[in-house]
């Protein structure tokens, strides 16, 4: 062989010998890491010396850290263990996302920045100044309502403490009026509410000289030939004369028309006295219906009894009122009721 061929064979043997040694070692003792990138030996040694238990712990830690749980964004779930958290607040000095009151360092830094730059205040700056302005009276509970807290503190100081229990209860009852009844809104309860209010107002208005008076007593009044009806309150009158004058005013137009059509003296010649005569008995008679349903002549009983008995009033023609009860019969009937 020539000298050049011998040199090439030696180089090939030398280059193949370490690979063969590595392969033999790997096959005998298992796969091993080699520092191909030229890193430090300590990293390779540390990584090679890691036990399978540590690798299992790492896997469990990563699974716990990435597990989905319920909670607000930025907050750490209470179910997690603090030892398993990859980013602990103690190590990283974490701060809450929305603090109630800012720290003093942030206040100083923000005020210096605004003074240096000359910009307008932001929301955070206004909140910082509000936190600075709060006094020692305010606490975490009442910082949102400082006025109420201040008034409470003042009232607590002013109220005397040495007051007997009986006196305090009596003063409270005398000073505070009873609670008013809540008004009913809506339909149909409005109807009942109005009835109740009207009843109370009527009771208050009817009470005179400490005596509870009775309510209004409305009675229908009709007239033969009249196309309309009227209602009168009998309790608003005190005698028969007032009632007759009121009925004259109610039915004046109808009686005037009747008299003019019958050929009586004209409207100009008809006076109040003639109209009273018409109502008192010449052409028309005033009658009433009692509780038994009998029609009687008005004026046969005393006024108080008439108010209690009367149910309806009717102005009849004289010819139609001939068979009605006379005064003696009405008096006998009233005595029997008494």
Swiss-Prot record:
This protein's name: Auxin-responsive protein IAA9
Notes concerning its domains: The N-terminal half of the protein contains two conserved domains I and II. Domain I includes a slightly degenerated ERF-associated amphiphilic repression (EAR) motif which seems to be involved in the activity of transcriptional repression. Domain II is required for the correct degradation of the protein through the SCF-mediated ubiquitin-proteasome pathway. Interactions between Aux/IAA proteins and auxin response factors (ARFs) occur through their C-terminal dimerization domains III and IV.
Key words of the record: Auxin signaling pathway, Nucleus, Phosphoprotein, Repressor, Transcription, Transcription regulation
Comp. bias (Low complexity): 9-21, 168-180
PROSITE patterns: PB1
Region (Disordered): 1-25, 150-186
Any one Gene Ontology molecular-function term assigned to this protein's record: DNA-binding transcription factor activity
Tissue: Highly expressed in the whole plant.
Residue span, PB1 domain: 216-318
Renumbered ranges of motif EAR-like (transcriptional repression): 68-72
Role noted for this protein: Aux/IAA proteins are short-lived transcriptional factors that function as repressors of early auxin response genes at low auxin concentrations. Repression is thought to result from the interaction with auxin response factors (ARFs), proteins that bind to the auxin-responsive promoter element (AuxRE). Formation of heterodimers with ARF proteins may alter their ability to modulate early auxin response genes expression.
Domain of life: Eukaryota
Organism listed in the record: Arabidopsis thaliana
Cell compartments where the protein resides: Nucleus
Primary residence: nucleus
Subunit structure of this chain's protein: Homodimers and heterodimers. Interacts with TPL.
Post-translational modification: Phosphorylated by phytochrome A in vitro.
Induction notes from the record: By auxin.
GO terms for cellular component: nucleus
Homology family: Belongs to the Aux/IAA family.
A GO biological process held by the record: response to auxin
